[in-house]
Amino acid sequence: MVEPANTVGIPVNHIPLLKDELDIVIPTIRNLDFLEMWRPFLQPYHLIIVQDGDPSKTIAVPEGFDYELYNRNDINRILGPKASCISFKDSACRCFGYMVSKKKYIFTIDDDCFVAKDPSGKAVNALEQHIKNLLCPSTPFFFNTLYDPYREGADFVRGYPFSLREGVSTAVSHGLWLNIPDYDAPTQLVKPKERNTRYVDAVMTIPKGTLFPMCGMNLAFDRELIGPAMYFGLMGDGQPIGRYDDMWAGWCIKVICDHLGLGVKTGLPYIYHSKASNPFVNLKKEYKGIFWQEDIIPFFQSAKLTKEAVTVQQCYMELSKLVKEKLSPIDPYFDKLADAMVTWIEAWDELNPPTKA
């Protein structure tokens, strides 16, 4: 049995890394009591809370946190007609927080994620580990069998090309979860009591050309490097699919990172995922996606961007055209999704105009 860490008595970190360069984005429909546990690690940072569902409901935030809160009315007011690209009644709404942030880095976490313990019993400062991951280079072009070569006590193994040892900039840090695993509905139904108790003390770069299922509940990224591609798609209310929002974004960012020569890491840090979602509700949301992903994944595996695409926005616009061309025959939903991808980029550029040289 794995338990969350007890953070009572841990002092608030008064020398936090990247304090003025990082926002924490939290999507929620409920009071944020869980932040009390995270106070020692997250209180120094600015929070962007994206309230999903009923905008008239009041969300309580523990005292002492610096935050701004956006509900659906705010999203509609700020984006106008372009608000149609932001999902409703789905945690995909979190990507609105990425858009309104003005910081270089983003850490996003779900409200059912608690502080984990490492094998020694020490509370894991997930944000600190994400920052370390993002500030260290990645090695997507050649796999190092000792995993992260830049970590203390590790290095490049014999046979690793010296020409590749500088690595590349890291765009994304994908963390993992103890307790409730991030399973799809069929697996949840077959293994309802399964809990993840394995703490693997490793960080690795996902190799170029390899896709992965990105989970949005413990994720950090360099907004300046990859932000415009972190669109969690059209999911939830009024859409034929849900629970594919973070994975859609992950497939898009991986194709773009591979094209632009950026790195994506996975592994540490762990959080404690406290609550299993209802597998029957999940199955209804995922049902079409379970079949569609057998076409979606080969699409992303074969997606090729042109050499003219040199910015994230240009890459994303090319990808949206490919989605319309290749995936729309599967279902009209993909035509709508491709249009929403374009709207997302237009809205991003409106709120984040390019700086003039």
UniProtKB/Swiss-Prot annotation:
Q: Which Pfam families match?
A: RGP (PF03214)
Q: Which cofactors must be present for this protein to function?
A: Mn(2+); Mg(2+)
Free-text disruption phenotype from the record = No visible phenotype under normal growth condition, but significant reduction in total cell wall arabinose. Rgp1 and rgp2 double mutant is male gametophyte lethal, with an arrest in pollen mitosis. RNAi-mediated knockdown of both RGP1 and RGP2 causes severe developmental defects and strong reduction in total cell wall arabinose.
Which top-level enzyme class is recorded in the Swiss-Prot or TrEMBL entry?
Answer: isomerase
Tagged with keyword Phosphoprotein = no
- Disulfide-bonded cysteine pairs: these are none
On the tree of life, the source organism's domain of life is: Eukaryota
EC number(s) per entry: 5.4.99.30
> Which terms does the UniProt entry file under GO BP?
cell wall organization; plant-type cell wall biogenesis; plant-type cell wall organization or biogenesis; pollen development; UDP-L-arabinose metabolic process
- PTM-bearing positions, type N-acetylvaline: V2
Q: Which InterPro entries match?
A: Nucleotide-diphossugar_trans (IPR029044), RGP (IPR004901), RGP_fam (IPR037595)
Tissue/organ expression: Predominantly expressed in shoot and root apical meristems. Expressed in epidermal cells of leaves, inflorescence stems and seed coat. Expressed in pollen.
Query: Which of this chain's residues carry glycans?
Result: R158
Please name the GO terms that the record assigns under molecular function.
cellulose synthase (UDP-forming) activity; intramolecular transferase activity; structural constituent of ribosome; UDP-arabinopyranose mutase activity
Protein modification: Reversibly glycosylated in vitro by UDP-glucose, UDP-xylose and UDP-galactose, but not UDP-mannose.
Write out the entry's keywords from A to Z: Acetylation, Cell wall biogenesis/degradation, Cytoplasm, Glycoprotein, Golgi apparatus, Isomerase
Q: Where is this motif: DXD motif?
A: 110-112
Q: Name one GO cellular component term.
A: Golgi stack
Q: Report the catalytic activity.
A: UDP-beta-L-arabinofuranose = UDP-beta-L-arabinopyranose
Site positions per UniProt: Required for activity: R158, R165
Q: Where in the cell is it found?
A: Cytoplasm, Cytosol; Golgi apparatus
Homology family: Belongs to the RGP family.
Give the domain note: The conserved DXD motif is involved in enzyme activity.
Subunit structure, briefly? Heteromers with RGP2, RGP3, RGP4 and RGP5.
Role noted for this protein: UDP-L-arabinose mutase involved in the biosynthesis of cell wall non-cellulosic polysaccharides. Catalyzes the interconvertion of UDP-L-arabinopyranose (UDP-Arap) and UDP-L-arabinofuranose (UDP-Araf) in vitro. Preferentially catalyzes the formation of UDP-Arap from UDP-Araf. At thermodynamic equilibrium in vitro the ratio of the pyranose form over the furanose form is 95:5. Is not active on other UDP-sugars (UDP-Gal, UDP-Xyl, UDP-Glc, GDP-Man and GDP-Fuc). Functions redundantly with RGP2 and is essential for proper cell walls and pollen development.
Annotated protein name in UniProt: UDP-arabinopyranose mutase 1
Its ancestry begins with: Eukaryota, Viridiplantae, Streptophyta, Embryophyta, Tracheophyta
**Which gene is this protein's source?**
RGP1
